[in-house]
Curated annotation (Swiss-Prot):
This is Large ribosomal subunit protein uL14. GO terms for molecular function: large ribosomal subunit rRNA binding; structural constituent of ribosome. Disulfide bonds: none annotated. NCBIfam families: PRK08571.1, uL14_arch. It comes from the Archaea. Coiled coil: none annotated. The gene is rpl14. Belongs to the universal ribosomal protein uL14 family. GO terms for biological process: translation.
Length: 132
């Protein structure tokens, strides 16, 4: 896992619903925890593009539903600024289910993957068709 080059806005708090962008059988995910988050009193833990989160599968195949799994956020609606000054935002909030080490469980990723997530997680960048 590599550090992030740009300032990512942590716009997805606990309880946020994400689209599952891989072919593991999950359709909709809900964030229940953000890994390595150190916050302040009464503030909800939140994550952004490239962060690892723990999710609960809300919609999907019967085998996948109600499971708690690690995932990596690959897209977010809230715009964030890159080091070169450009601002990036996506159409939806999406994540990919991974193993605890960061290797994707699925064999394909649907839609674009942010450059920040691809740089930080090599396993995700291997499966990405579009890196934006």
């Amino acid at each position: 896992m590599k550090g992030l080059g740009s300032t990512i806005v942590r716009s997805l708090p606990n309880g946020a619903r994400l689209v599952c962008a891989d072919n593991t059988g999950a359709k909709e995910l809900e964030i229940i925890a953000v890994k390595n988050y150190t916050g302040t009193v009464r503030r909800l833990p939140a994550g952004g593009v490239g962060h690892m989160v723990f999710v609960s599968v809300k919609k999907g195949t019967p085998e996948m539903r109600k499971q708690v799994l690690p995932a990596i956020i690959i897209r977010q609606k809230k715009e964030y600024k890159r080091a070169d000054g450009t601002r990036v935002k996506f159409e939806d909030n999406a994540a990919v289910i991974v193993t605890p080490e960061g290797t994707p469980k699925g064999s394909e990723i649907k839609g674009p993957v942010s450059k920040e997530a691809a740089e930080r997680w090599p396993g995700v960048s291997r499966l990405a068709k579009i890196i934006h």
